[in-house]
Amino acid sequence: MLMYQVKPGETLESIAADFRTTRQALLQANPGLNGGQVSAGQSIIIPGIRNPDTIPYRIAVSLNGRTLRLYERDRLVKTYPIAVGKILTQTPRGEFVIVNRQPNPGGPFGAYWLSLSKQHYGIHGTNNPSSIGKAVSRGCIRMHNRDVLELASIVPNGTRVSITP
């Protein structure tokens, strides 16, 4: 199970939304929560998400470099070109985990969707391959379909994703 440190301004409801779970599931996993109140710096259990420290893979996204790097332990496995958010809808920076996945999600998301632990954001394919390498998305990380399919076949849910400028 994932141990999560509450950030300033977060509530149990916002954490539940980010991790695609319910307030009730969080309360059941954390019986010591007083009335469901959380405070910044507090550690809580996120049920159903594997601990990233038990996963040999991690993903490092460079927004300025427009690259996604896949590591196995500390060894670089592969670097993929990506598209990122445009100025008005920037890709969020920070530490996230993959919380769920959906093959063939429909719409503009290409062949695969990997949800990040921030509601409405993910790593996905594209129906517009010429967009790769540009700042054109609404904040998601966009990959060539063949690349997102390859990535999804390697990394499990719970994989750590670091997004830096």
From Swiss-Prot:
Pathway: Cell wall biogenesis; peptidoglycan biosynthesis. It is found in: Spore wall. Keywords: Cell shape, Cell wall biogenesis/degradation, Glycosyltransferase, Hydrolase, Peptidoglycan synthesis, Sporulation, Transferase. The active site is at 124 (proton donor/acceptor), 140 (nucleophile). The keyword Kinase does not apply. GO terms for molecular function: glycosyltransferase activity; peptidoglycan L,D-transpeptidase activity. It is an enzyme of class 2 (transferase). Residues 2-46 form the LysM domain. PROSITE patterns: LD_TPASE (PS52029), LYSM (PS51782). It comes from the Bacteria. GO terms for biological process: cell wall organization; peptidoglycan-protein cross-linking; regulation of cell shape; sporulation resulting in formation of a cellular spore. Its EC number is 2.-.-.-. Residues 57-164 form the L,D-TPase catalytic domain. One of its GO terms (cellular component) is spore wall. Belongs to the YkuD family. Probable enzyme that may play an important role in cell wall biology. LysM domains are thought to be involved in peptidoglycan binding. Monomer. This is Putative L,D-transpeptidase YkuD. It comes from Bacillus licheniformis (strain ATCC 14580 / DSM 13 / JCM 2505 / CCUG 7422 / NBRC 12200 / NCIMB 9375 / NCTC 10341 / NRRL NRS-1264 / Gibson 46).
